[in-house]
Amino acid sequence: MATKLHFLLLLFAFFGLASCKTHQLIHSSAPGNELFKVAILYPNGEGKTFDMDYYEKTHMPMVAGLLGSNLQFYEIDKGIAGRTPADPIPYLAVGYFYVKNIAAYNKAIAENRDAVVNDIKNYTNIQPVIQVSEVRKIGLNAAK
């Protein structure tokens, strides 16, 4: 039930973002439409641990609160398979923050670095890998 609720909330957030211009694709590279995605990846490996419940209910909401109105929405992925169902998962989890201003994101994280970093040990023994991307386009499936 909780998984369905999270999925519905994610869909609501996505369509809320996309509904601003439902008649066209949103090109984030256009002035005023900038959107950045900060991906936090937790690689799988021998001896790696990850408490998804804590990450979902405590860590990500705490960091989201630090980002204020700059945060558009966030996502949490739980790895379930690799390239094929038999392959090990490459990442135990991936968290995403979608923000309008990457400088404001960096400032908020820098100002709260100790709180964010010190909380990591509460849910994992993995050193996360961070990637910042510019979202270039958000499209909806026209076949539906």
Task: Give the positions of each predicted feature.
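Bacterial Sec-dependent N-terminal signal peptides
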Residues: M1-S28
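Macromolecular interaction modules
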Residues: C20-K144
